[in-house]
Amino acid sequence: MKNKSRYFLAELLGSCFLVMIIVGSGLMAENLTNDVAVMLIANTIATGAGLFVLITVFADVSGAHFNPFVSIAMTITGKLKKKLLPFYIIAQLVGCLIGVGLAN
């Protein structure tokens, strides 16, 4: 059970931070300029950099999926045990909801 809680926490935090980065950088980009192209570039760079850091931090703990469809694909390909899939999906969804709430 100890490992399951580590996986759960890693996916929850990673998903939460990823959504906070995406939403937060989008909100900041809107305040940066009126040029939509510049907004998209700023949001993309921030999201890519944030995702790189999150994958670096959480890859060794949970695989850094941060997305239910990635976890499902990993289960189908045999890289994630079926019994862990519900923990991953719940953690990711809860993390995303918390992240949106904190970013707004």
Regions found by a protein language model. Name each.
Residues 1-104:
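Membrane-interface helix-loop junctions and terminal tails of multi-pass membrane proteins
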